[in-house]
Amino acid sequence: MTGHRPAGGRHAAAPGRAGRRIASSPMGKLPLRARLATTIGGAAGRMSRLAGRGDGSVIGGVIGLRVEPDLLALLAAGRRVVLVTGTNGKTTTTRLITAALGELGQEVASNAFGANMEAGLTAALGQAPDAPLAVLETDEKYLPTVLAATRARVVVLLNLSRDQMDRAAEIWMVARRWREALASAANCTVVANADDPLIAWAAAAAPDVIWVAVGQRWHEDSWCCPQCGSHLSRDELGWRCGECEFTRPPARWVLDGSSVIDSAGRVHEVSLSLPGQANRSNAVIALAVSEVFGVEPAQALARLRDVASVAGRYTQVERHGRQVRLLLAKNPAGWLEAFDVLDEPPVPVLLSVNAREPDGRDTSWLWDVDYRVLRGRPVFVTGERRLDLAVRLEADQVPFELVEGVDDAVDQVSGGRLDVIANYTAFQQIRVALGRAE
C-alpha cells in the first residue's frame, strides 16, 4: 500500500471503444456527435419524466450511447470522478459522499436515484455537463468497464455478498474482475473496507489503497480465503488465513461503535439523521473519500448530518393517520441491516417481496435470512412473491397476515407507526402507492 495522493487534475487520454482515444481537456467542448447525443438523450429523459414513466435517469443514457458509444468516456473527461460499488449501501454512500464534497463549493454530478449501469451514469453526467466532480454509484458487474471509461480518481469498495445470483456472476468472480481492473488503475485511490475479506483481496492489487475498518455483519459468503481457498479464522483483531499470508490489512480509519478514529488519530462522534450502524459505516467511508479531496472530517460530518433520506429510503410518510417508514432490503445482508433499525416491538412491520428482473428471479435467498427477530410484533406480508415469504416465515414460526398492499396493512394498524421492508421493485411500487415518497 502506498500513501494516497491529493485529488488533482485528470490524467491523459482515456481509451474509448475499439482503441479510440478520448482527449481530457477539462470542461472542454464535446465533439459534435457527443453534443448531439447528449442533447437527444436529455430530451428523451425529460419526455420520460413528463409522461410519468420514471425519472428519466436511464432512457436518456440509453439513447445517448446509441448515438455516441463513447459518450460516457467523453462526458467523464476533465472531471474528478468517484465510483462507488458493492452489494449493499451504494446509493446511500453515494449520497453521503456527494453531500460531503459539497463543502468544496463545486457542483457535483451524481446518479442520485441509483441508475447504476452505463446508461444511468451517462445520463447523470449529461445532466450536469459543467460539474467538475462526479460521484457515481456503479453496479458491481460494470465496475471494470466504467473504471476504464471514466479513469476514476477514487474507487470505493464497500462489501461483497450474494445478491441476484441468477443475474450477476458468482461473487468470487466479481472480486477477481475488480482485482484485475484495479491492478492497472493508474492515478486512482481505492477506499476499501478492510473487514470484508473479498473486498480486501480485490483492493490489495491496487497501487494506492486507503483501508477503512467499518465492520462486516454478514460473514456467510467469506469463510474461505479468496487467495488460497483455505478456511478463514476470525477474532477480535480481524480475520486471517491459516494457510497463506493473507490477513486483514491495518486500517487508517476505524469505526468504533458510534465514533470514528480518523487517519490522523482524532476521534469524532458519527451522529447522523440516517438510522443504524450500517449507515455509520457508510458515513465513515464518505469521510475517508472526502479527505482525499481535501475536506476535513469535522466539516464533512456536519454535512452528513443533513442527509435524512436517500431515494425514498428511511422516508416517513403519513398515511391514514399513521406514520409509515420505508426501508429497502434486497438480499440477506440487507435484510439483517433493516431488522437492526426497526422500532422495538410491538411496532408492526410490513414485508414485501417481488422477483422481477431487477430483483433477481430466484427467491431462494429468503431462506438465508433469520426472521425469528420479528416474533412479538404484528407482521404483514405482501408483494408478488408473498407466498414464498409466507412459507419462510412459517418455518421460523413467525405469525403473519397476508395483505394485498400497503394500504391494507395501514388500515389494520390501530395507530402510530408501521415499518415497511421491501426489495427493489416492491419498494418502488410502495413509493408510488404512497405518492412517490422521497
Where are these regions (language model features)?
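ATP-dependent carboxylate-amine ligase
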Residues: H4, G8-H11, P15-V58, A77, ...
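Short hydrophobic/aromatic-enriched beta-strand-loop microsegments
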Residues: A134, V154-L160, D208-G215, V349-L351, ...
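Short glycine-/acidic-enriched loop or helix-start segments at secondary-structure transitions
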Residues: G120, T145-V146, D166-R167, A200-A203, ...
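Phosphate-binding loop of NTP-binding sites
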Residues: S25-W211, W223
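Acidic, Mg2+-coordinating active-site environments of NTP-dependent enzymes
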Residues: R79, L157, S161-R322
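Buried hydrophobic packing segments
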Residues: I97, L101, L121-L125, A283-F293, ...
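Fold-independent oxyanion-binding glycine-rich loops
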Residues: T87, A112-F113, E137-D139, N159-L160, ...
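A short, flexible N-terminal coil/short beta segment enriched in small residues
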Residues: L71-A99, S271-S273, V289-V292, L301, ...
